[in-house]
Design a protein with these regions (language model features):
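Double-stranded RNA-binding/processing signature
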Residues: 1-283
């Protein structure tokens, strides 16, 4: 009788598991001395600032079906248990309030449109990322190897901007644990000092790149209504979507379209193109 082996049906055509390798030897835990340098005072709750440095790509997670996590090299830190997204949300609200109050006092009488436009320029992630670089935060951003090598790593201003917002929330909670009544004021003073040290307000006002705001003003003046935006197309998997957004003419037709990896960027570019097409800006 033949005893030749046959392949198990369950293994025939089985896909090789994908190897997930988040390990990044460039990651470093921020020292207490660096936190104190950035804050200009000693921190009480160091863990908050360290969490503010963690991008979601370097957080421990369950491996997806058919995926294995590669062993951690000796020169890499362990995955973190929490990222900075919750802190970023809180910091975003705190920063909006501080900057809004500051601009109203710095430029009295300019009006809501001017303040809103300038605040938008100051607190957008690209600009905040530039401030984070000037503060020396970039070396302490913790991220996956993929984000480091493929997504611009420590030069990625959007990630650094999110880190700065999370840092502001960490500072607020650190101070609030010690003295809740003065916590906001202390954070406010720090933010204002950063702005007045590192921002050229004259240049920022002269180089307004908030095209959505510019288009809003142009539409209100010309058509007496705000512009409307429409999602024209969405492509790609959930984790890597590409959006095409359109600006609608008051008659309902699509005036211009633009494509980007998030809706806000696509709307900004579509707004810029609409300003040119309608003759409100030079190409």
């Amino acid at each position: 009788m033949s005893t030749s082996a046959t392949a198990s049906p369950s293994l025939v055509g089985a896909a090789e598991p994908k190897i997930y390798n988040p390990w990044n030897p460039a990651n470093k835990e921020i020292p207490v001395a660096e936190i104190a340098r950035i804050n200009r005072c000693e921190p009480k709750r160091v863990e908050l600032y360290r969490q503010a440095c963690v991008h979601k790509s370097f957080v421990a997670r369950e491996a997806h079906e058919g995926q294995l996590i590669s062993p951690r090299p000796d020169d890499c830190m362990s995955l973190k248990h929490a990222d900075n997204e919750h802190l970023e949300f809180v910091g975003d609200g705190i920063l909006d309030a501080i900057v809004g109050d500051y601009l109203e006092r710095r430029y009295p009488g300019e009006g809501e449109g001017f303040w809103t436009s300038l605040r938008s320029d100051l607190v957008n992630n690209e600009h905040l990322g530039g401030l984070a670089m000037k503060l020396g935060m970039a070396p302490w951003l913790i991220m996956s190897r993929h984000m480091e090598e493929v997504c611009a790593g420590r030069s990625n201003r959007r990630m650094l901007g999110s880190m700065l917002e999370a840092w502001i929330a960490a500072m607020y909670r650190d101070r609030a644990a010690d003295d809740p009544k003065t916590a906001f004021w202390r954070v406010q003073q720090w933010v204002i000092e950063v702005l007045e040290t590192h921002v050229d307000f004259g240049e920022l006002i002269a180089c307004n790149t908030n095209y959505k705001d510019q288009l809003l003003r142009a539409f209100q003046a010309t058509f007496h209504q705000p512009p409307r935006y429409k999602e024209v197309a969405t492509e790609g998997p959930l984790h890597n979507r590409i959006f095409t957004m359109g600006v609608l003419h008051p008659d309902g037709s699509v005036l211009t379209t633009a494509t980007a990896r998030n809706k806000k960027e696509a709307e900004q570019e579509a707004s810029r193109l609409a300003l040119i097409r309608l003759g409100f800006a030079a190409s």
